[in-house]
Amino acid sequence: MTPENLPIERYDDQLAEKTARLKTLMSPFTAPEPEVFRSPVSHYRMRAEFRIWHDEDEMYHIMFDQQTKQRIRVDKFPAASELINRLMSALIAAIKPEPILRRKLFQIDYLSTRSGKIIASLLYHRKLDDEWQQQAEKLRDDLRAQGFDLQLIGRASKMKIMLDQDYVDEVLPVAGRDMIYRQVENSFTQPNAALNIQMLEWALDVTTGSKGDLLELYCGNGNFSLALARNFERVLATEIAKPSVAAAQYNIAANQIDNVQIIRMAAEDFTQAMNGVREFNRLKGIDLSSYNCETIFVDPPRSGLDDETVKMVQAYPRILYISCNPETLCANLETLQQTHSISRLALFDQFPYTHHMECGVLLEKRV
């Protein structure tokens, strides 16, 4: 596979290989058959990052081969959304003749939405000045005149210049309801929108008929907690990154949801608060004891859950665990299976043609 050529004819084979690998990993835990969710075979990534290569008068996007570290020119990128592909060529063509915009530009990051909005972040190895901003505003206006609903951002060491705003608002149809999600530049968002919708709908399905409240750790911009709010009386969610918390608060208001409370703190600190180990100022006014959380939702980083958090989640009757790394999920399951059994298992092909797997498990307390 090269960046410009996806092995589309191998899509079914690679998905079957992942399914078999997941079954093998899950075999010690008497898991049910995985529910398998397919990705679009191309144009599935809503984000992409490219280095920029300068060769005399030429300038183009590049990526590096993961094995050989060789430089690969990328003029089209079928893994990314069609909108990203269109902007890639238009942006390079517009920047190339402009020395002020070209000089020491080393990377471009793209973030697009299904709703037709896109952010391009231009990263430089130099300080950006008023002259750069004037040229960037002209560039933005020219590209908007070509039909791009574009936000343009300049970045350099300890510098960030927003010409307008640093976010786009995405709209995802989730189980019959349009959900609005503010996505902030340089913050985590799910890269594969089609699979994100399927993950949200699967999470809704497995929590249908839930009793009590939901606790979520690592909630990001509220991706799961807002979609799941309709299945629970109340949702209490934690997130450490400030921009993500701000986006989550906006998303709560935009979706007119009144039963979600977001707390800005690390999952490890929240574990201490729940266990009564110590008190935190940012929890003032929130009565944790008033929540009746029968279900806990976790979507941890690749490293999985730390030992203390694993112990904490074992106290809940139901655990919904979304994992971007089945190996660390299995390490956590070694402990979780002592108290819980897996009732649902899903494979989400977020990253086709790579070894990466996203999966979900619903664990229910053993009687």
UniProtKB/Swiss-Prot annotation:
Active site, UniProt feature: C324 (nucleophile), E358 (proton acceptor)
Keywords: Methyltransferase, S-adenosyl-L-methionine, Transferase, tRNA processing
This enzyme's EC code(s): 2.1.1.-, 2.1.1.35
Record-linked Pfam families: tRNA_U5-meth_tr
One GO MF term: tRNA binding
CDD domains xref list: AdoMet_MTases (cd02440)
Enzyme class, first EC level, given as a word: transferase
GO cellular component: cytosol
General function of this protein: Dual-specificity methyltransferase that catalyzes the formation of 5-methyluridine at position 54 (m5U54) in all tRNAs, and that of position 341 (m5U341) in tmRNA (transfer-mRNA).
Family in the record: Belongs to the class I-like SAM-binding methyltransferase superfamily. RNA M5U methyltransferase family. TrmA subfamily.
Protein name: tRNA/tmRNA (uracil-C(5))-methyltransferase
